[in-house]
Curated annotation (Swiss-Prot):
Co-factor note (free text): Binds 1 zinc ion.
Gene Ontology molecular-function annotations: metalloendopeptidase activity; RNA endonuclease activity; zinc ion binding
Protein's gene: ybeY
Enzyme class, broadest EC rank: hydrolase
Residues annotated to bind Zn(2+): 132, 136, 142
Organism: Clostridium kluyveri (strain ATCC 8527 / DSM 555 / NBRC 12016 / NCIMB 10680 / K1)
PROSITE patterns: UPF0054 (PS01306)
Name used for this protein in its record: Endoribonuclease YbeY
Pfam families: YbeY (PF02130)
Length: 164
């Protein structure tokens, strides 16, 4: 189950955007072998809101493009398909039978800025950030160069599969 919550008024959230975001998440989950019914919440915000959330949660007082709030814990350098593929989840990880993976907060205003900066569409930039964030929910990280390379390869693979 994917919940989309628009809390900004700078960028119009169209049916097309909602559909592309949802299909990007579904593709990432499929490609990462998440075979449980699961729940992810996506909150659309503007730059001011994401800056506040970034400061409150990470003590970083600046605008960022996307924030991920995973609900599951992972051993270092392990991802969902390595840890939880055949795992029996306890009830507290579930919500109405859905595995709660976590929350994504994305600044659509920043997506628009970055799409112009990188020379591709707003939809492509938004979906890239959504896939990036889903991978964080699934245990991927990019603090080490080797992990960053793996994560980047997965992002591009998933975007290609999603035809974005």
């Amino acid at each position: 189950m994917i919940f989309l919550d628009n809390r900004q008024d700078k960028i119009e959230v169209t049916d097309k955007l909602e559909k592309i975001v949802t299909s990007s998440i579904e593709c990432a989950l499929k490609e990462e072998k998440v075979n449980f019914p699961c729940e992810i919440s996506v909150v659309f915000v503007d730059n001011e809101n994401i800056k506040d959330i970034n400061r409150e949660n990470r003590n970083i007082d600046r605008v960022t493009d996307v924030l991920s709030f995973p609900m599951l814990e992972y051993p270092e350098s392990k991802v969902f398909k390595e840890v939880y593929l055949n795992y029996k989840f306890p009830e507290y990880d579930m919500n109405d039978g859905n595995l709660v993976l976590g929350d994504i907060v994305v600044s659509l205003e920043k997506c628009e800025e970055q799409s112009r900066e990188f020379g591709h569409s707003f939809f492509r930039e938004t979906c890239y950030l959504i896939v990036h964030s889903v991978l964080h929910l699934l245990g991927y990280d990019h603090t080490e160069d080797s992990d960053k390379k793996i994560m980047r390869e997965r992002e591009e693979y998933i975007l290609k599969k999603a035809k974005l």
